[in-house]
Regions:
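Sec-dependent N-terminal signal peptides
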Residues: 4-13
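Substrate-gating cap/lid alpha-helix
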Residues: 280-318, 361
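N-terminal secretory targeting modules
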Residues: 9, 17-179, 354-361
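Oxyanion-hole/transition-state-stabilizing segment in secreted/luminal serine hydrolases
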Residues: 221-257, 262, 277-284
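A short helix->loop->beta-strand "cap" motif at the edges of active sites that frequently abuts
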Residues: 267-272
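Short hydrophobic segments within beta-strands
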Residues: 86, 183-184, 275
């Protein structure tokens, strides 16, 4: 009897440790909203939208599409499945040429290792409505803590996580702390990354444990008052701005102070951290690009020197998304994953220092 019990236990352990997903595996699906969906500025009728465009008005058609996309959102869950898949129902889908389809329309899976570090596990896109997109197979059946990044430039009506029938799946409590809004350009949305988890806000989150709530809108972060309305309505502890990448020098001059004053009138006590825009590598030889970008940077620097003195709790920090060879760009404007890594690292110390000053550790 004792031998039989031992054999049964060993067989069960062997099954749990096996790294072979059955060829005829059947999947059981759970809606992501039944797990832990993180990265949202606020609740929305469609939980995969970032902004409720029925509530907030003033957006252009393109901006409406962008704020309904899921950039910066991720699902946290725990499972012992040997395989993980995703079944999606899509609305708008972007097919831009300067960004991998996996980033625009696909999913990016990270799993915590034994040291508690988030490690890349799988990424894939197939763009089919209701199709079962199998991200990974043949994992062991130990319990795993997972973080699945949603597409950066697609709208979803449903996102269902698939695990093999009989496996467990449940919500994972978020290890990320605080609620820090980040409003910005294509850089902040993650354009030109290879996969969703490689945008600089997502790299910053994994590196620091600080939760960033992304409102990145490619080409459309121009200090507009209606975006300020969204940020004011959000329950956040701090705000970070990639505010000088899209507007011209003249637009920065006209809009910066009214934008700051509008937000500060509603949220006077939270830190507002403005980042200088990065060096765009199109400037290496193109004189017109160099002149236009230099004018923006100089205007931002001049006005922010005044702003940090004029307004309480307003800060200005420098950024870097290039290496000494100036060779980290994908299209002359947006950095590659490598460039975004530099960006995330360049802001880590100053942002953490400012947050600590305001009791956000």
């Amino acid at each position: 009897m004792k031998r039989l019990l031992t054999a049964t236990i060993l067989a069960a352990l062997a099954f749990a440790a096996t790294a072979q997903t059955p060829k005829n595996v059947q999947y059981s699906f759970t809606e992501a909203t039944e797990l832990n969906l993180i990265g949202k500025l606020m609740d929305t009728p469609n939980p995969y939208h970032r902004v409720d465009t029925c509530r907030f008005k003033g957006f252009t058609k393109g901006e409406n599409d962008q704020v309904r996309c899921s950039a910066g959102l991720a699902v946290l869950f725990r499972t012992n499945s040997s395989t993980i898949s995703v079944k999606s129902e899509f609305g708008y889908m972007n097919h831009g040429e300067n960004t991998m389809g996996i980033a625009l329309r696909g999913y990016d899976l990270y799993i915590k290792d034994a040291d508690g570090k988030w490690v890349y596990a799988a990424s894939k896109a197939d763009g089919r409505n209701r199709g079962n997109c199998v991200l990974i197979k043949d994992m062991d059946r130990s319990e795993k803590e997972c973080m699945l990044y949603l597409p950066i430039y697609s709208e979803e009506y449903s996102v269902q996580i698939g695990v093999e029938e009989g496996a467990t799946i449940e919500a994972l409590e978020s290890p990320f702390r605080h609620r820090v809004a980040i409003f910005g350009s294509s850089f902040t949305q993650g354009i030109s990354v290879s996969r969703a988890g490689m945008s600089y806000p997502m790299q910053f989150m994994r590196n620091t444990g600080i939760q960033l709530l992304s409102l990145g809108c490619s080409g459309n972060c121009k200090l507009q008052p209606y975006f300020a309305d969204v940020l004011i309505a959000a329950d956040v502890d701090a705000m970070i701005f990639d505010a000088f990448s899209n507007p011209s020098a003249q637009m920065i001059k006209e809009r910066l102070f009214p934008f700051i004053e509008k937000i500060q009138a509603a949220k006077p006590d939270i830190p507002l951290i403005f980042m200088q825009t990065i060096y765009r590598e199109s400037r290496n030889f193109c004189k017109s690009s160099d002149s236009f970008e230099q004018a923006k940077q100089e205007m931002a620097a001049t006005l922010m020197e005044e702003a940090v003195k004029k307004y309480d709790n307003v800060y200005f920090i420098q950024t870097n998304a290039s290496d000494p060879s100036k060779d980290t760009s994908v299209d002359g404007t947006r950095p590659s994953d490598w460039g975004y890594m530099y960006w995330a690292k360049s802001i880590e110390k100053p942002v953490l220092k400012i947050l600590r000053k305001h009791g956000l550790k």
